[in-house]
């Protein structure tokens, strides 16, 4: 038995296959891959809109200059550590980045970005995401082999599109797949 080749998926998007993942948090999910190494993987679901929050009250921003609520959508990034929040954003904002990608995207998780967004000085595009998705070593590779996920390149226009409910369908369309014609009987040739 030969060694498996490792393909780093950091900066890519995972698209849940429509007939394999049929319920739960991953049903019709899109996951932006933050990190993928031989030690495991971490990603953020970016199409699970949960609610809207006021940045000023949520982050307890103490500033009287902001007199009206600054409402932003909040997304569920996965089942792990819901108390952790991340801003997945365009790379035009580069203060105290947690991660920076080569596809015009970055991730921040500090209070400064929430204040900058509230004051209109933040990134042009951003999503506030709580929680994340994680895989143990080899787990994601196994899920890919069993066709739980499709992989696609991603760009900021796709991630920051207005309608989160249509992002998954748009991802399939981008891949040239019509959900109606997607077989529930899939496998590797």
Curated annotation (Swiss-Prot):
It comes from the Bacteria. GO terms for cellular component: cytosol. Gene3D superfamilies: VC0467-like (3.40.1740.10). Belongs to the UPF0301 (AlgH) family. This is UPF0301 protein RC0043. It comes from Rickettsia conorii (strain ATCC VR-613 / Malish 7).
